């Protein structure tokens, strides 16, 4: 699946047991692919071409794929759901802080958070690395994060098994003290 054009990430949950899993919700003896990017029909074909016989794929996106006899088989998978992230950052600057410093900090945070995978949590303390590596001439005096436009959190953000972090520079507020 990862070799397909446009596919950026894939996570596959497998259930080899006789009992359905609750979270992630994987029926017994099946697998649950979650795919970011790519064309639905190509993804379904790749799953069909590589899945074991008699094992069902699971998900809310279902497409028919023809076997060598022309018989259609339902192939299922999911797409990750975007989880918006908002950051409010308060910094104190000195005379060496560049005029584009705010943009550099925002870009560094967007670059870092865009590397997180499907279901990968946002770890609060790790945000300081891209912030501090963006430029010099400042220090962070406060930071809050969250999933709404007025973030108040100072702890990690849990990302569910089928979610992916969605961040843009406009979701990052930089204030000065």
Language-model regions, residue ranges each:
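An aromatic-glycine-centered, glycine-rich loop/turn in mixed alpha/beta architecture
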Residues: 78, 97-177
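Short acidic amphipathic segments
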Residues: 1-16, 89, 127-146
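Carbohydrate-recognition loop of C-type lectin domains
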Residues: 2-120, 176-177
